[in-house]
């Protein structure tokens, strides 16, 4: 076995001898070189081991070791110092652990802690587990998951069931690791549980190979994430059952009642020709056939109203009545009216809105159609508007509701009263475009404009007779 002295650096080795040198007078006698015993006089013939152990023990020999020769100076290149020796073990004469510890001491690697050194350390001295496999008893044994470890150990190292345990995957090793490579258990019960894991793996094989497989892929370690993440697994299954129910093994794992999502299932041959694309009747959630559970009133709903594609036509109108009549208990249900009859009326209303100013409920006749005839037998007049007919009837009845306030004259039409008032006021809002003459009524202006048209025609005839049109001139140019 390998026994190592835990030194932090070269200063730890020189601290005690340096203090002894500071308090020792220079007159102390020195050991002559000839009085030094030979290497053969020491047990084992190891002079270097004896010298280092004697200097570390203290006393006069310690002072003499460090005062002999020139003044000691701290070596610059040393990073590790200590004493080691190999002690043969009868049970394992060729144990690879001793060779690994020897190589780690020479190369400056971190050695595995001994049980005495680990027991003597306090929780504050060990902020993190010393060995790479210190977490193995806690990770792979279910009995050790609730053991009481030092508080600083739990602050520095993750727990066995933590979600971040996969980040430490390179440090994990299979459960059949030598017990000597593990952290020392805190109690005899932990020691007995840790001794159950043994195997032929060598330390360097475990460090180089890493952890085989994923986290939680061995033995009892699989139960911990399943137990702690059961709620997450349930939510994932619920999400999968809603998004892709066809991939589930059976109807037992479905979250919705059977038939709840089968409202639009197709039945090609049940509805006759031309109705292969129409889905079947709405099935209530209580049962697959619609006979069990509540919601039996859904059976009478025809398929024409439940089509998600909005199919409407003569076929849906034909089979809806027969379908309701064939169903049990559907004789008292009134057959729905076909929606195909309401569409032409809607189109007509839209055309009426776009074509004219009247609303859809207006009873105005179409343009160029005189639907309002005079009720008087001797009169054959027809009118396109009702207000025109009302004005015409005032001629037959002699009713004159409009009276002038100046001369008290009555008129049957309001426009006649307006033009009459202009005679009293002298207002002439209409003017001729050619001569500028003004008129009180628009019809008077129109008659006057005809006079100018006749004068223009006469002047063009005169110019044509004189030959001005041959020169490219016209009356307008003159």
From Swiss-Prot:
GO MF entries: DNA-binding transcription activator activity, RNA polymerase II-specific; DNA-binding transcription factor activity, RNA polymerase II-specific; RNA polymerase II cis-regulatory region sequence-specific DNA binding; RNA polymerase II transcription regulatory region sequence-specific DNA binding; sequence-specific DNA binding; sequence-specific double-stranded DNA binding; zinc ion binding
Any one GO BP annotation for this protein: regulation of transcription by RNA polymerase II
Region (Disordered): 15-37
Induction behaviour: By nerve growth factor.
Subcellular location: Nucleus
Zinc finger boundaries on the chain: C2H2-type: 372-396, 402-424, 430-452
InterPro entries: Znf_C2H2_sf (IPR036236), Znf_C2H2_type (IPR013087)
SMART domains cross-referenced by the UniProt entry: ZnF_C2H2
Gene Ontology cellular component annotations, sorted alphabetically: nucleus
Family: Belongs to the EGR C2H2-type zinc-finger protein family.
PANTHER family recorded: EARLY GROWTH RESPONSE PROTEIN 4, KRUEPPEL-LIKE TRANSCRIPTION FACTOR
Protein name: Early growth response protein 4
Gene transcribed to yield this protein: Egr4
């Amino acid at each position: 076995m390998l026994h190592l002295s835990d030194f932090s650096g070269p200063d730890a080795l020189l601290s005690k001898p340096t203090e002894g040198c500071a308090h020792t007078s220079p007159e102390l006698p020195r050991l002559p070189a000839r009085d030094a015993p030979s290497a053969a006089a020491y047990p084992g013939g190891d002079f270097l081991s004896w010298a280092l152990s004697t200097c570390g023990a203290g006393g006069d020999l310690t002072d003499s070791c460090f005062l002999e020769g020139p003044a000691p100076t701290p070596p610059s290149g040393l990073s590790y110092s200590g004493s080691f020796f190999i002690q043969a073990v009868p049970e394992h004469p060729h144990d690879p652990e001793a060779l690994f510890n020897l190589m780690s001491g020479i190369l400056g690697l971190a050695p595995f802690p001994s049980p005495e050194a680990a027991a003597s350390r306090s929780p504050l001295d060990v902020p993190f587990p010393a060995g790479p496999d210190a977490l193995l008893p806690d990770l792979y044994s279910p009995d050790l998951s609730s053991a009481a470890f030092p508080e600083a150990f739990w602050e520095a190292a993750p727990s066995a069931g933590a979600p971040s345990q996969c980040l430490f995957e390179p440090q994990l090793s299979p459960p059949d690791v030598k017990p000597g490579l593990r952290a020392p258990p805190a109690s005899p019960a932990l020691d007995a549980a840790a001794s159950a894991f043994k195997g032929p793996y060598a330390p360097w094989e475990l460090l180089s190979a890493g952890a085989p497989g994923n986290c939680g892929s061995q033995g009892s370690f699989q139960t911990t994430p399943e137990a702690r993440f059961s709620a997450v697994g349930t939510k994932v299954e619920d999400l999968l059952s809603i998004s892709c129910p066809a991939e589930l093994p059976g109807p037992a794992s479905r979250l919705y009642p059977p038939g709840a999502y089968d409202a639009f299932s197709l039945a090609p041959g049940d509805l006759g020709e031309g109705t292969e694309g129409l889905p079947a009747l709405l099935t209530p959630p209580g049962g697959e056939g619609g006979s069990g559970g509540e919601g039996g009133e859904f059976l009478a709903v025809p398929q024409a109203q439940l089509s998600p594609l909005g199919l409407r036509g003569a076929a849906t109108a034909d089979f809806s009545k027969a379908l309701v009549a064939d169903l049990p208990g559907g004789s008292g249900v009134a057959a729905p009216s076909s929606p195909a009859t309401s569409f032409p009326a809607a189109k007509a209303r839209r055309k009426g809105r776009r074509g004219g100013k009247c609303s859809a409920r207006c009873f105005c006749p179409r343009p160029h159609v005189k639907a309002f005839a005079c009720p008087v037998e001797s009169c054959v007049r027809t009118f396109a508007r009702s207000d025109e007919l009302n004005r015409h009837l005032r001629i037959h009845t002699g009713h004159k509701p409009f009276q002038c306030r100046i001369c008290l004259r009555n008129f049957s039409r309001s426009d006649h009263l307006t033009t009459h008032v202009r005679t009293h006021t002298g207002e002439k809002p209409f003017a001729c475009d050619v001569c500028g003459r003004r008129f009180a009524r628009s019809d008077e202006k129109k008659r006057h404009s005809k006079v100018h048209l006749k004068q223009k025609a006469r002047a063009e005839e005169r110019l044509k007779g004189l030959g001005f049109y041959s020169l490219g001139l016209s009356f307008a140019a003159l």
